[in-house]
Structure formats: C-alpha cells, structure tokens
Amino acid sequence: MRVGMGYDVHKLVKDRKLIMGGVEIPYELGLLGHSDADVLLHAIMDALLGAAALGDIGKHFPDTDDRYKGISSIKLLEEVGKKIDEANYIIENIDATIIAQKPKMRPYIDDMRKNIADALKIDVDRVNVKATTEEGLGFTGSGEGISSQAICSLNSVSNYIYGAADMTNCRSDCGGCMGCQNK
C-alpha cells in the first residue's frame, strides 16, 4: 500500500469562474491560475502522483506550457488516472478537504465526488470530499483564497490475488486483479 498527500492554494479574484471538483459554483469571485485553478482536483492529483512516486502536477502539466492554459482540471485528472493505471496501481481511496470561508461547498460536494470518481473510473464510495472554514483566520478565513488538502491510498495490482477475476470493467491489460470486481 502507498499513501500520497497533496495540497494546493489559489487566490480569489474577480472575472474568473469558481470551479471546485469540476463543478462551477456560483460566486462573485473565482480562483486565479494557469488552468481553471481547481484547488481540490490539484490537491488530489498531487496526492495520487505522490503515492505512485510520479512527481507532481507541475512536472506533468507545467504552467509554462500554453497547452494547459485555461484547461479543465477534470481533463488533467483523467490523465493522472491513466498514469496511475499505467504504473499498475489501483486507487483504494481519496479523502480531500476544501478550506474556504465562502462560498459554502456542502450543496456541491456530491457532484464533486461523482466528477472525481468518473474521471478516475472508480466507484464514488472511494472518494470523500469535505469542506471547512478557518473561522475567519488566515488568508482563506479572510476570503483572499481557497486551499485544499488531499490524501490517497494506492495498492499495487500485484498485491491483489490473481485468479478468476471479473474482467468486465477492466481498464488495463494487467492479467486480472480482484480489484476490478468492485467496479
């Protein structure tokens, strides 16, 4: 089993959409960044890449590359999911926290979880997202920005018992792991 941790933060500014977990959230401010600045997905991607010892999102999607300017972080998460598959890991779980004073995230969390699970081709019950405030303290508490933290666990395909696995939803040519039975 491998564990990864990710963290991201972006500044809130006018004239930008607020995208969190692939969901557009109605708000007068949005996050400033090279891509759509989805801090939740950026933290999750860094956690996944870290757990697999594949670097970080800056290595794979540098902000100096115009191909990623304004790109949806859901597309980047899909690419990270492919890299995790290619490295022969299975995502066991993801647990993430959004830290924002405003707006309230609770109404959008189920959609965020679904978007993350769909992008990674995993069951939604392997993804948890929660939100908290900093009680008015710090840059998130004062409304200057939003941050996110994520942790994930991966398991190597070779750690699963091979045998008569249900290959119906298999995403790789690994030879059949029991992990696919849960899809």
From Swiss-Prot:
PROSITE patterns: ISPF. It catalyses: 4-CDP-2-C-methyl-D-erythritol 2-phosphate = 2-C-methyl-D-erythritol 2,4-cyclic diphosphate + CMP. The keyword Ribosomal protein does not apply. 4-CDP-2-C-methyl-D-erythritol 2-phosphate binds at residues 8-10, 34-35, 56-58, 61-65, 132-135, 139. Its EC number is 4.6.1.12. Its cofactor is a divalent metal cation. The record marks H34, T133 as: Transition state stabilizer. InterPro entries: MECDP_synthase, MECDP_synthase_CS, MECDP_synthase_sf. A divalent metal cation binds at D8, H10, H42. SUPFAM superfamilies: IpsF-like. Pathway: Isoprenoid biosynthesis; isopentenyl diphosphate biosynthesis via DXP pathway; isopentenyl diphosphate from 1-deoxy-D-xylulose 5-phosphate: step 4/6. Binds 1 divalent metal cation per subunit. One of its GO terms (molecular function) is metal ion binding. HAMAP family: IspF. Involved in the biosynthesis of isopentenyl diphosphate (IPP) and dimethylallyl diphosphate (DMAPP), two major building blocks of isoprenoid compounds. Catalyzes the conversion of 4-diphosphocytidyl-2-C-methyl-D-erythritol 2-phosphate (CDP-ME2P) to 2-C-methyl-D-erythritol 2,4-cyclodiphosphate (ME-CPP) with a corresponding release of cytidine 5-monophosphate (CMP). Belongs to the IspF family. This is 2-C-methyl-D-erythritol 2,4-cyclodiphosphate synthase. It comes from Lachnospira eligens (strain ATCC 27750 / DSM 3376 / VPI C15-48 / C15-B4).
